[in-house]
Amino acid sequence: MAFGISESCYRYQAKLSSENAEIADWLVKLTEDETDWGFGLCYDYLRNVEGFQWNHKRVYRIYCELALNLRIRPRRRLKRHKPEPLKEPIKPNQVWSVDFMHDQLSHGRKIRLFNIIDDFKREGLVIDAGYSFPAIRVIRSLNQLIEWRGKPSVIRCDNGPEFISHEFTHWAKQYGIRIEYIQPGKPQQNAYIERHNKTIRYSWLSKNLFDTLEEVQEHATTWLWFYNHKRPHKANGGKPPLAVA
């Protein structure tokens, strides 16, 4: 007795094969472009940014077949007490978190990055690159941001000299902005910006050698757009900050 396979079954198999190739192409491209991304970010990007509805298990199977799961070696995590979770804002401009990062150019000159995020949806607002950031420079960056976005109710920061200076506290008082200082030695109290800093470090800052401050600023501005519009974020259910209603 002979058994035949219908034409529709052949078409279905061909479609599966074609889709699998497309999935593989996307995964290879994403992991080449974003070398710090694991499967979770890749899948969230494909589903929430590109709009593909591919099954999670199917995409992961192809991810493993390509040996992409062997790229990133898991870091050994230290056991530590869970910090008290920060209160989630319910609207934009309720709380901004600010902080500095340090790095250096190819010839050794030290630079700083002044980072600002809106805690609501973790939107990246500013990455300002400079050689030094006295209080007056910090105020200038904030004023430029407030001009187009409006002022926050609260700014959360550490006890760095720029933030406890008379100039900064006087400026905040004039605007009616409350400064929420974290306790010394407890960066987890500013966890949102600390996590943002880590993402900046691993996504591009530690991967590139820059010759000039202008190169750093250009790269930072380009990446910030990508972060807000394209990069999935766990806090937003795997969606980029500006893709969340």
Predicted regions located by residue number:
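Charged DNA-binding/catalytic regions of mobile-element recombinases
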Residues: M1-A245
